[in-house]
Amino acid sequence: KAQADAERIAQEKLAEQMASEKALKDAKIIAAKKRFENQDIHFEYDSSELSSMAKTVLKEKAAWLKTNYSAGITIEGHCDERGTTEYNLALGEQRANTAKSYLINLGVSASRLNTISYGEEQPKDTGNTESAFRKNRRAHFTID
């Protein structure tokens, strides 16, 4: 009986340890996804050209996508409020497609990358200042 109790206790401890390790792994996955989704790239006024900082961020995202090979993402193109709705929708699309093309060139499969343009419709900052406009000229990434 003592041996059976010892084996049962050992199994319970092992199960607890495995559950704890799984919870830690799950927490790390959630944190990595949040980091992925919370890091936008930004653009200059009236431009879809990638800055060196944007390229660095996209390289990090490509590395994450290569280790999380089943994940698909949506790249959202956003603009500041200057310009017509139609123009900003087109510019937002160019921004999303520029980011998509760069990720493809880094080895990410195009089938995993979706794009959408929101133009000026979803500002990150509703202020009417250059600082607010700068925050709104972005590509945002969500994990599908």
Give each language-model segment a name.
Residues K1-G72:
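Periplasmic peptidoglycan-binding/tethering modules of Gram-negative envelope proteins
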Residues I41, I143-D144:
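Generic structural signal for short, solvent-exposed loop/turn connectors between secondary structure elements
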Residues E76-T142:
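Periplasmic OmpA-like peptidoglycan-binding domain that tethers envelope proteins to the cell wall
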